Amino acid sequence: MIYTITLNPAIDYFITLNETLLVDEVNRGSHEIYKAGGKGLNVSKILSVLNIPSKAIAVLGGFTGQYIEDSFAKDPNIEMIPIPVDGMNRINMKANYGKKALCINGSGPVVNDCTVQFLLDEIAKINADDIVVISGSMMHGFADDFVTALAQAVHQKNAKVVIDMEQITMEQLKECKPYLI
């Protein structure tokens, strides 16, 4: 089984503005799209398109977390495993106007020890030869070495780790001993 882990999921809100962005003015949009995502969840989406099942572990909270979870509910190839967090998942806004874009990413909630433990409990359920993809950014509150600890927990189960993250150092990446980066 392939597991994907998304430590900082988001709702991406795309809007096309009718005119140039005006500061201190009301700007009107003509087209809006909401997409549930996060890098690990996007990996699960691609796997699903290829008809490959996956289990998507995602840290979710608030109405935004519920929206993200609901967005994957009807996909038969993705089993969503929500990890509860206090607060709301972030909303990232992308406003396109002309040939320019304004991108604003929310920060999201801060994880606590309970969230970390729920996540480690899910990792304890994986089997040998499973593949665990850790992808994207981390919410505030995760320890700097959390991904290393997560990778070590995966290795203890004789499973493979794939890492696609910007927030870890090369030294941490080496400690994770990834199967693929």
Regions flagged by a language model, labelled:
Residues 1-3, 102, 130-131, 180:
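Structural motif
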Residues 7-12, 85-90, 167:
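Short glycine-enriched loops at secondary-structure junctions
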Residues 1-23:
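Positively charged, low-complexity intrinsically disordered leader regions
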